[in-house]
């Protein structure tokens, strides 16, 4: 199975769980997205890797149109249903990959993405597409899990992420994001950094992680160096904290 198909399969079967996930449905970053879009009258917004639609739902009341874009058709069906339930008539869905955006040049005032890019097969190509479909003077806000600055910490969190979700590619560090945006012709900065508390049981259940992999994650945490356990604040039940960041670019 190719990676794009793997992502679509993994998240198509878990769409309902992501809609009700408190980790995804809440957060101060959603308010930041909404306030940012509200500053641009009649904005047309692209939400890349929209997941169950929480970022789209947050910005839709402040936008002229929101295109919720995802590789998994079942995710998009979930977004359609939830948008209808919320009375958000200016959201439309579109299926596709981040690396091949099916839109005309200079189409969007804002391009946003929340907790998606760590699954993208080719981030440089995706950012080139973002540059192409963004209007002159348009803006970008990306939110994602961040890789750790120290190699010891980074190796462990990438391993944990991959064990939990075989479609995971990489949680990029802040400096990597700046370099990626710079290479795509953007001027980017880290707008915010924070930590997310991960409740282990619901985290693996949401992704339907097979039990042998759950056991492997627990073993990795329990056998990791003290520095790793302390940094990620690993609890006895396997719960821990992840780094997150918001990148602003234009």
Report the location of each language-model feature.
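Conserved class I S-adenosyl-L-methionine
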Residues: 1-40, 54-58, 74-78, 82, 141-163, ...
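A short acidic, Gly/Pro-enriched loop at the edge of an enzyme's catalytic core
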Residues: 99-110
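A short SAM/SAH-binding and catalytic strip from SAM-dependent methyltransferases
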Residues: 109-122
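A short glycine-rich, Lys/Arg-flanked "PGG" loop and its adjoining helix->strand segment in the class I
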Residues: 124-136
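Conserved Class I S-adenosyl-L-methionine
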Residues: 187-250
């Amino acid at each position: 199975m190719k990676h794009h198909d793997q992502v679509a399969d993994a998240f198509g079967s878990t769409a309902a769980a992501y809609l009700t996930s408190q980790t995804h449905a809440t957060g101060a970053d959603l308010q930041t997205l909404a306030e940012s879009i509200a500053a641009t009258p009649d904005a047309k917004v692209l939400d890349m890797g929209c997941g169950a639609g929480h970022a789209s739902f947050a910005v839709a009341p402040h936008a002229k149109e929101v295109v919720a874009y995802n590789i998994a058709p079942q995710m998009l069906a979930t977004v359609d249903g939830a948008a209808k339930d919320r009375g958000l008539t200016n959201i439309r869905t579109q299926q596709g990959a981040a690396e091949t955006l099916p839109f005309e040049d200079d189409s969007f005032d804002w391009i946003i993405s929340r907790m998606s890019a760590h699954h993208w097969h080719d981030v440089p190509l995706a950012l080139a597409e973002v540059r192409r479909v963004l209007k002159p003077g348009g803006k970008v806000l990306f939110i994602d899990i961040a890789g750790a600055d120290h190699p010891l910490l980074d190796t462990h969190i990438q391993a944990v992420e991959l064990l939990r979700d075989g479609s995971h590619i990489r949680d990029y560090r802040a400096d990597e994001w700046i370099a990626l945006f710079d290479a795509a012709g953007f001027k980017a900065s880290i707008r915010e950094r924070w930590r997310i508390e991960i409740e282990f049981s619901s985290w693996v259940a949401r992704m339907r992680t097979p039990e042998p992999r759950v056991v492997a994650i627990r073993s990795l945490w329990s056998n990791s160096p003290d520095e790793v356990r302390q940094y990620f604040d690993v609890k006895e039940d396997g719960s821990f904290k992840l780094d997150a960041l918001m990148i602003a670019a234009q």
